[in-house]
């Protein structure tokens, strides 16, 4: 898209520029394996696999749906995108949302975070 994107402000749940040790390692390993930066799709896959793995550990390897869902309710973990959890009532993901600005760093465009909303739930399911 080019330099015309510089300064654009967006809100999203992930940027490869997220400043955490886990994300830096994730970006490094992902780029090594794929020759491009990770994005929200790849980190979603990472989180999904992490959630399944941890749920299987909690269930002792039981794989039926009800047992796995029960194990996932209320789980909390550190993701490359920040602290994540599963709402025990709705079973939806609870995640940070970042306000980002497009900036050029080392000749590349990046979404750089400058504000954050923690523990954002699906607004259509939040009780009023």
Task: Identify the function of each model-found stretch.
Residues 1-128:
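Extracytosolic ligand-binding ectodomains
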